């Protein structure tokens, strides 16, 4: 099964947490990309500060690695308040959430990552806390049990999720601000790589940064990870300068091609071409052919390949596109020309 150790995995890897923290932007002015989100948050934060209020509860959603945690920290910094961070799976009992809520000061930010994974019992405690700044606590057991209400200071809940569709309607409706993060353009990722290289003390040419950006799958976390690996290559095989040629050599050595595909992506596409004549093929047959789990194909591999137009989902199964054949220098089959997509290229319902 594929894990997050793939070089182009969007999920964080334990070894890079301290590095990511060092290069993470602290203010909205430093945040690159997502212009719509930045503009709206700038207005909402400025208005809240002008009134002396806490910011409305904010939900940030989108694919992993796009900067949801970074935005939560920026919101706290711009509001000049403290931030307490946790995640949905960690809050197993209502008491866990109650302990965090009662330790908040007025205006503080409570950041809950993977908020879609909150247990139902914990989520119910969150409703009155978000809406009325009150905490309902049960004291005693059996017939003697009674409920008391504790007043909470006005705080801002920032929730982050990669699966907004899994949020319950009552929870989603309690967020006054909802922001979706989109994949980054190559130009934006180039700026991010240039900035990160400067902070890491890497002598990077703009062409070298652009070469990394083109292969980063629209994701800053991947771009920064590739930057660190190319830096290593430049120090050992070059003179330490990050040029386009050095970046190309390093990423080719790491099997990340010009479209950001790695060996697992290419293995999946080639299995469809060589073993199933380009499709259509069912996902279970495909999983057996490459010895991977169905969920891995649907949740990890397919979304990017569909988004980039290398694969289609049709009513009869998965089909590789003309672009996939051309990527490998092969001639498309007749099935490619007649396939009707169930999911349009560039979208994924995984």
UniProtKB/Swiss-Prot annotation:
Has 3 domains, the large (RuvB-L) and small ATPase (RuvB-S) domains and the C-terminal head (RuvB-H) domain. The head domain binds DNA, while the ATPase domains jointly bind ATP, ADP or are empty depending on the state of the subunit in the translocation cycle. During a single DNA translocation step the structure of each domain remains the same, but their relative positions change. DNA binds at residues 294, 313, 318. Belongs to the RuvB family. Mg(2+) binds at residue 69. Its main location: cytoplasm. It comes from the Bacteria. Pfam families: AAA_lid_4, RuvB_C, RuvB_N. Residues 258-350 are annotated as: Head domain (RuvB-H). The keyword Hydrolase applies. Its EC number is 3.6.4.-. GO terms for molecular function: ATP binding; ATP hydrolysis activity; four-way junction DNA binding; four-way junction helicase activity. Residues 4-184 are annotated as: Large ATPase domain (RuvB-L). This is Holliday junction branch migration complex subunit RuvB. Keywords: ATP-binding, Cytoplasm, DNA damage, DNA recombination, DNA repair, DNA-binding, Hydrolase, Nucleotide-binding. It comes from Chromohalobacter salexigens (strain ATCC BAA-138 / DSM 3043 / CIP 106854 / NCIMB 13768 / 1H11). It is found in: Cytoplasm. ATP binds at residues 23-24, 65, 68-70, 131-133, 174, 184, 221. Residues 185-255 are annotated as: Small ATPAse domain (RuvB-S). Homohexamer. Forms an RuvA(8)-RuvB(12)-Holliday junction (HJ) complex. HJ DNA is sandwiched between 2 RuvA tetramers; dsDNA enters through RuvA and exits via RuvB. An RuvB hexamer assembles on each DNA strand where it exits the tetramer. Each RuvB hexamer is contacted by two RuvA subunits (via domain III) on 2 adjacent RuvB subunits; this complex drives branch migration. In the full resolvosome a probable DNA-RuvA(4)-RuvB(12)-RuvC(2) complex forms which resolves the HJ. It is an enzyme of class 3 (hydrolase). InterPro entries: AAA+_ATPase, AAA_lid_4, DNA_helicase_Holl-junc_RuvB, P-loop_NTPase, RuvB-like_N, RuvB_C, WH-like_DNA-bd_sf, WH_DNA-bd_sf. One of its GO terms (cellular component) is Holliday junction resolvase complex. GO terms for biological process: DNA recombination; DNA repair. It catalyses: ATP + H2O = ADP + phosphate + H(+). Signal peptide: none annotated. Transmembrane segments: none annotated. The RuvA-RuvB-RuvC complex processes Holliday junction (HJ) DNA during genetic recombination and DNA repair, while the RuvA-RuvB complex plays an important role in the rescue of blocked DNA replication forks via replication fork reversal (RFR). RuvA specifically binds to HJ cruciform DNA, conferring on it an open structure. The RuvB hexamer acts as an ATP-dependent pump, pulling dsDNA into and through the RuvAB complex. RuvB forms 2 homohexamers on either side of HJ DNA bound by 1 or 2 RuvA tetramers; 4 subunits per hexamer contact DNA at a time.
């Amino acid at each position: 099964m594929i894990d997050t150790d793939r070089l182009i995995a969007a999920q964080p890897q334990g070894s890079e947490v301290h590095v990511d923290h060092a290069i993470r932007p602290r203010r909205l002015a430093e945040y690159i990309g997502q212009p719509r989100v930045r503009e709206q948050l700038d207005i909402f934060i400025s208005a809240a500060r002008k009134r002396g209020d806490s910011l409305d509860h904010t939900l940030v959603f989108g694919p992993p690695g796009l900067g949801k945690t970074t935005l939560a920290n920026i919101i706290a910094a711009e509001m000049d308040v403290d931030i307490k961070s946790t995640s949905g799976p960690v809050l197993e009992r209502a008491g866990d959430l109650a302990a965090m809520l009662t330790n908040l000061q007025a205006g503080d930010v409570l950041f809950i990552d993977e908020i879609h994974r909150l247990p139902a019992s914990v989520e119910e405690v969150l409703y009155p806390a978000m809406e009325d700044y009150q905490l309902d606590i049960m004291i005693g057991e059996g017939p003697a049990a009674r409920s008391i209400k504790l007043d909470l200071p006005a705080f801002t809940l920032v929730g982050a999720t990669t699966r907004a569709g899994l949020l319950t309607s009552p929870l989603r409706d309690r967020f006054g601000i909802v922001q979706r993060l989109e994949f980054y353009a190559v130009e934006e990722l180039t700026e991010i790589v240039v900035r990160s290289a400067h902070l890491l003390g890497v002598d990077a040419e703009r062409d070298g940064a652009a070469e990394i950006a083109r292969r980063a799958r629209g994701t800053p976390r991947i771009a920064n990870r590739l930057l660190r690996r190319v830096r290593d290559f430049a120090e050992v095989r070059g003179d330490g300068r990050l040029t386009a040629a050095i970046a190309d050599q390093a990423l080719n050595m790491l099997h990340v091609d010009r479209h950001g595909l790695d060996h697992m992506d290419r293995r999946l596409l080639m299995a469809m071409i060589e073993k199933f004549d380009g499709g259509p093929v069912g996902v279970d047959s495909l999983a057996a052919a490459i010895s991977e789990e169905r969920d891995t194909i649907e949740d990890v591999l397919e979304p990017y390949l569909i988004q980039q137009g290398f694969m289609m989902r049709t009513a009869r199964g998965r089909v590789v596109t003309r672009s996939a054949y051309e990527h490998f220098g092969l001639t498309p089959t007749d099935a490619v020309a007649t396939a009707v997509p169930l999911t349009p290229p560039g979208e994924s319902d995984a």
